[in-house]
């Protein structure tokens, strides 16, 4: 496959992506289609039974109209049931969480601007805030990646590992640390606090939040009639978890993307040409920088010099 032209490699990549897209659609249709049809049939049966029982005092179409209004309101993030104090969706902690979901492109939940002014401000806020967020992320990446390269360099020196093996070891360790600290542990806490949430649902919520998928209508504490102070503190804690977790996930992904094995896969789709200094840089350059900051290992006293 090394003799393929660049346009052939790009075409192969596009075809592989389309095949993966189609495979995902088929699998999701097979898994989610039958449960959705089953729930729809159950809802229709319940609706028909309710209409038959209250036909004398219920005008035709009144129940469907009421349910349509309630569902449309719920789809915009406005609670129609439960405690009225909890139903205030646009309080300050919830608004902070919504603003963070815009700047981090997470966008989970049902909150959405309803007024024309809110929609216009959301577009302007995102247009100005997203570039600023990207600049902040780039700055944090530039500051934190050299710090992460120092343990890798220490391991390479003291364990006599090559830079590539030390980088792979650090990437695996960092991935496990992020997965346990920002996915599994918060999922266990959410599973214990949120009574109506399964462990798989809690793991899915944490993963979808940190991966910016955001396809989740679960918001911790919503619908449990909590004290307003506890509920607001929970929203602020969720905001802090989202920001810190996204930063940790970004560093883990960046560490994996700088592995020589991953960079070699990327070079397959680049135009063939001489190897540039940029291609030779990356993680090995960070190792050299980190090695230069380490003090030289002093030989042990009384130890014979190695031949």
Curated annotation (Swiss-Prot):
GO molecular function: outward rectifier potassium channel activity; potassium channel activity; potassium ion leak channel activity
Its membrane topology: Multi-pass membrane protein
Annotated signal peptide: none
One example of a Gene Ontology biological process annotation: potassium ion transmembrane transport
Entry keywords, A to Z: Glycoprotein, Ion channel, Ion transport, Membrane, Potassium, Potassium channel, Potassium transport, Transmembrane, Transmembrane helix, Transport, Voltage-gated channel
List of glycosylated residues: 83
Family per similarity comment: Belongs to the two pore domain potassium channel (TC 1.A.1.8) family.
Topology feature Cytoplasmic, residues: 1-10, 141-170, 254-307
Matching PANTHER family: POTASSIUM CHANNEL SUBFAMILY K MEMBER 7, POTASSIUM CHANNEL, SUBFAMILY K
Intramembrane segments: 92-119, 199-227
Pfam families reported in the protein's UniProt record: Ion_trans_2
Name assigned to this protein: Potassium channel subfamily K member 7
Lineage, uppermost ranks: Eukaryota, Metazoa, Chordata, Craniata, Vertebrata
CC per GO annotation: monoatomic ion channel complex; plasma membrane
Subunit structure: Homodimer.
Principal location class: membrane
SUPFAM superfamilies attached to this UniProt entry: Voltage-gated potassium channels
Function: Probable potassium channel subunit. No channel activity observed in vitro as protein remains in the endoplasmic reticulum. May need to associate with an as yet unknown partner in order to reach the plasma membrane.
Gene3D superfamilies the UniProt entry points to: 1.10.287.70
Subcellular location: Membrane
InterPro entries hit by this protein: 2pore_dom_K_chnl, 2pore_dom_K_chnl_TASK, 2pore_dom_K_chnl_TWIK, K_chnl_dom
Membrane-spanning residues: 11-31, 120-140, 171-191, 233-253
